[in-house]
Amino acid sequence: MISEPMGFYTDTTVCIGCKACEVACKEWNQLPTSVDNLLEMSGDSYDNTRRLDGTHWRHVKFIEQFSEDRSDGRWLMMSDVCKHCVRAPCLEVCPTGAIIRTEFDTVVIQSDTCNGCRACIAACPFGVIGVNLCSF
């Protein structure tokens, strides 16, 4: 019996940008908290992760909208993750079979099988895949 595909929905109208979902994703997938335990701050934003990469699989992006004099503004939150494409280009180009589709219909990279060729990075139309330097 094939399980019914499931999704992860983030209601950005109630998101406060606490990034607890980022932390939970890292914990669930056993990813390091940050490379060398340093946070990369952008200098002009509260968004400390800034992008998806090999150690950040979920990103809550802060979209900051301010008036010209910065006296009035608002934050909008946008959640970004792997799209788990039905026809996943990353899966199709992987020469070692390290990228698989699970029984839950999710696309997963098996780091123990990956040879680090980075073909998947070039193939991803959303720019989601990155290299986890801790794995190599």
Question: What are the residue ranges of the model-derived segments?
Answer:
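Non-ligating segments of multi-cofactor redox enzymes
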Residues: 1-136
